Amino acid sequence: MHLSPDTMNMVDDGCLSTESYHDLGKGGVSGISGRVHSIDVILGFSKDQDPLLEPSGRHKVDEDQLEEQEKQVNADPYSHLQIPDQTQQQQSVYHDTGLFSTDKCDADLGDPRSNVESDSRSPDIPDEDQPKKKHRRNRTTFTTYQLHELERAFEKSHYPDVYSREELAMKVNLPEVRVQVWFQNRRAKWRRQEKMDTGTMKLHDSPIRSFNRPPMAPNVGPMSNSLPLDPWLSSPLSSATPMHSIPGFMGPGQSLQPTYTAHPGFLNTSPGMMQNIQPMPPPPYQCQPVFNDKYPLEDVDRSSSIAALRMKAKEHIQSMDKTWQPM
């Protein structure tokens, strides 16, 4: 856009003056307060020249309101800040109405536990719905006299009736219920003691303990001569001659050596040779040591085995006697 020299001359000299420049530097609002420089003025149009450019109606009212607001801002630039007196007055009003009271806040924050308890207790629960606490009975401490009388009554009867319990309660100065409870506990203790006693008796009578045999005497041995001979050993040969006179008899100190050997040609020998051969006695019977055992089954087995051995020994002796007879 190009401006003619005539239009440039029509621009007000006050716009380019130093005073207006300083006013614009100090503040945008204060610099505008003196004179409003519109676009029409800058362009050089005056209000009288063109009536179409003249503001009318609503625009004119808005410009007037803006001018008034700018004047008020220039008159009191710190009007948006409150005066201390006014703030104090407002605070006093708040305190009077109770909206800005610190006492209420302190009271609410002072005991939060009470608030919680009040909230928890707010729903009213009837007494029937609340769980009842279990009544715990105190333990009774009996004196020596009371225990003595109760033990005497327990020895007479483990299950006393109501009348005897009441009489005993009056005697020992105790309630009848306590006496009844004492008898119940005493019977339970007695049953436990009986079970323990029966268990120990079974343990003592168990067959495992029967194997603990006493030690054998030193004079008892398999080759001991102090043992008496059984009557079944008394054969005609042994009764007629003593044991030491029998050839082939060995003393306790001699070593066991074979004294009789069987030969296939022994039966085919002549009678003259048979006279020179002396008959050999049977080997001495070794007596087994006797044990005192409590277990009955072992006694039965041992007696049966001994009887069988005796029968075999008798048969052997009879057969040997037949062979010793002269042919």
Curated annotation (Swiss-Prot):
A motif (Nuclear localization signal) lies at residues 310-314. One of its GO terms (biological process) is camera-type eye photoreceptor cell differentiation. It comes from the Eukaryota. SMART domains: HOX. SUPFAM superfamilies: Homeodomain-like. GO terms for molecular function: DNA-binding transcription factor activity, RNA polymerase II-specific; RNA polymerase II cis-regulatory region sequence-specific DNA binding. The keyword Protein biosynthesis does not apply. Plays a critical role in eye formation by regulating the initial specification of retinal cells and/or their subsequent proliferation. This is Retinal homeobox protein Rx2. The lineage of its organism: Eukaryota, Metazoa, Chordata, Craniata, Vertebrata. The gene is rx2.
